[in-house]
Amino acid sequence: GYTTYNSSINNLACHSYSNGKTNRLTVESSYSSFYCSDFDSDGVNEVMLLSLYTTENDATANMLVYSEERNCLYSKASVKMDPNITRFKNITVTAAENGQNVLIVDGCFANDDTVTQIIYFNTELSVLRNPLFKEKDKNITQRSADIICTDINNDSVTEIPVVDKLPSTSDEDKSAVADKISWNSFYPQSEILNHLSDQIPDYQNGYSFTVPESWADGTYTVRLDSEKRAMSFFEWDSDNLGQKVFEIRAFKLEQWDVGEDSDAYTLIYKNESTAYAFADVNEETSLSISEDDIKTAFSLMTVNNI
C-alpha cells in the first residue's frame, strides 16, 4: 500500500504473479492498517483491512478475497469498529478455542485508554463479527493500564486482558490500590471471553504476582507503597481490610547486597539493578500461601505486557 495526504488513510496496491509476469490487481480500497491470514478456514489467505474513522471513512474491518477469474480483490464481508479509536496499538492473529484464526486489535482512544476488539469470520452465517464492540455500551476491555493482548502461558494463543481495581473503602487513596488483570481466551461459538487466570501488577517496579486459584474474588486486596517500593497483600472481608498475608518488595541491588532494611526478607529474584524479595508471611490467614508458591507466582513484566 501507499500513504495519502491523510496519515490515517492508505491506498491498497496488490499484484499477482504468473508465468513470469506481474499484473496489477483491480483494488479500490483504502485502509489504516491491514493483516493477511486465513480467516474463513478455506486454506487461502484473505486481506483484512482496518480503517480508523475519518470524515471520509467509517471505522470498519473489511475482509477482501481474491477472484482469479476476475483478477481482483473484492469484499466478502465487513463489520463496524469503534469510531472513537484514534490509533492502532497492537494487531495480531491468533487461533481461537475452535482453531479458527481471529484478529485481535488493541487500539487507543484520545485519552490514551486502550481497548480490544476481536474481528472474526462467522463461517455459518458468512458474516464478519466484532462482538466486543457495542455502540451504546462500554467495552469491558477498556483500560488505562498500558497492557496489550499477549500470550501469557506460551500456548501460542493470544490472551485478552480485562483490568479492574481491587476492593477498597470509599475514603482510600485509589492510587495505592492495585489493579487486577484478568486474562481471557476467546470462544467464537458463544462470542464470550473465557477466564484463565488473574495477575496483580506492580507497574512501577516491573513485576506481577499470579493470583492462586484458591483465592476467590472479593476475598483479597493489595496495596502499593511507592516510597517503600512494596506490594502488600491483605484479606478483604465485608468491605473491610483484613489481616496482612505477605509483602513483596523491590530493593536497589546495592541496598540488598549490604543488607539495608532487608534482613527479614527472602530473595525471589535479582538482576543487575534490582532484588525482589518477600516477607511477613502470615500462615494463620484464610489466604495463607507457602514461600515456594510466592516465588512461583512472581514474574517480571515486559514492555506493555505481563
Model-derived regions: residue spans:
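Beta-propeller blade termini
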Residues: 31-39, 50, 87-96, 144-154
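Short coil/turn segments at the loop-to-beta-strand junctions that recur within blades
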Residues: 28-34, 79-87, 135-144
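Acidic/hydrophobic-patterned starts of short beta strands in beta-sheet-rich repeat architectures
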Residues: 1-3, 41-50, 96-107, 152-164
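Secretory pathway targeting signatures of secreted, lumenal, and periplasmic proteins
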Residues: 212-267
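Structural motif
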Residues: 7-14, 55-65, 110-120, 167-187
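Beta-propeller fold detector
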Residues: 23-29, 74-80, 128-134, 194-198
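Surface-exposed amphipathic alpha-helical segments
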Residues: 278-306
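Short loop/turn segments that connect beta-strands within beta-propeller blades
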Residues: 17-20, 67-70, 122-124
